[in-house]
A protein has these predicted regions:
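Surface-exposed intrinsically disordered loops and tails
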Residues: 2-42
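Intrinsic-disorder/low-complexity loop/linker signature
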Residues: 7-9, 17-19, 43, 58-59, ...
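Active-site or metal-binding loop neighborhoods of secreted/extracellular toxin and effector enzymes
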Residues: 115-137
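Acidic/proline-rich low-complexity IDRs
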Residues: 9-11, 20, 28, 61, ...
């Protein structure tokens, strides 16, 4: 169940460009509130694992996991709230189906696109998929 009051809920309908969405993702990965919500023990190597929940332009609720840390599929493999810039991140279990090319290129299990991990996916690709979802679903 998506909770619009928890720190993981993001109002993305105001985001208009891929560059703005990349900033939203980087800010989300370094969000202290979200980290405290999901990983109160900051020494945990998995502390930058979050569910990102959002509502689309037409009101559909969607979510996906966005992760980055020294133990996950991201570039660079670092864990730090202060680091803030990742070129590739780990995405998992989106509640909608990504575009065919993204699934074919990045999904670990192409037969189950909403039930798989997308390792080392460029943050710009994630931003494009989020923008498409916000505008069309």
């Amino acid at each position: 169940m998506i909770n619009e009051t928890h720190p993981g809920f993001l109002p993305l309908v105001h985001v208009k460009t891929k560059e703005e969405m990349v900033k939203v993702i980087h800010n989300w990965l370094s969000s202290e509130e979200a980290v405290q919500e999901y990983c109160p023990n900051m020494r945990n190597p998995f502390c930058l694992r979050h569910r990102m929940d959002f509502r689309t332009d037409v009101g559909t609720l969607l979510n996906l996991g966005i992760q980055a840390s020294s133990q996950l599929y991201c570039t660079p493999r670092k864990t730090s709230l202060e680091y803030g810039f990742y070129s590739d991140i780990q995405v998992d279990y989106p509640s909608w189906t990504f575009s065919h090319n993204v699934i074919k290129t990045y999904a670990e299990n192409t037969e189950l696109p909403c039930g798989t991990v997308y390792p080392y996916i460029p943050i710009e690709v994630v931003a494009e998929e989020l923008l498409k979802a916000v505008r069309t679903l």
